[in-house]
Amino acid sequence: MNIKDHLSKVTEYFSPKVIGEVNDVYVKVAKIKGEDIPWHNHKDEDEAFFILEGELLFEEEGKDSFTMTKGDFYVVKQGINHRVSAEKECHIMLIENKSTAHTGEVESHVTRSIEEQLK
Amino acid sequence: MNIKDHLSKVTEYFSPKVIGEVNDVYVKVAKIKGEDIPWHNHKDEDEAFFILEGELLFEEEGKDSFTMTKGDFYVVKQGINHRVSAEKECHIMLIENKSTAHTGEVESHVTRSIEEQLK
């Protein structure tokens, strides 16, 4: 299936949807707009970001913030506090362990259960 | 780093290069042109394909062959014999377990060790 068809089913910002299962990881797509994702980390889990469309502001502790654009690929390593936001709508692909909570241990109004992400 | 920069370093067809490590998986890019990849399977490992540019002919046992185009995402499940080829140069992203041999247990002239893929 094309990534655009998967994205067309995403109706909420910050709400990742699983598009594939590859061994112990889920591949997901999400749409980001705004600053609603809280600072968080994934204690034992790396998380990969790939920009499909638009621009994503990436903030990571101990680093200068940087802007990711279409085609950029970045892995935030386990345990590192980070936050992503976007002024305009941005489409991303995520590669995460199945066990990864997308906002880490931080519960916020954008937090979605894995069941919701699998719908 | 942008996927185009990673791809610009790929000088051989069928020779995947690791662009990121996410927990137990490697994310790779590769360029495909021709029919040199042998039929193979990955006994215990799923393998994800994402088309970055061009068209990829996907053949999988028990299915009609199909053509993947830019933005298409597909996971071939563990143990299923498959083969990919491309008439014109095609750029792909792969998501594979670190332990996955890219041509399965089949050794061919395109087979590359993980050390070569990490260079």
What positions do the PLM features span?
Chain A
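Glycine- and acidic-residue-biased ligand/ion/polar-headgroup-sensing regions
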Residues: 25, 44-57, 61-62
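Conserved short histidine dyad/triad with adjacent acidic residue
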Residues: 26-42
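A cytosolic small-molecule/anion-sensing beta-strand core signal
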Residues: 23, 52-53, 69-70, 88
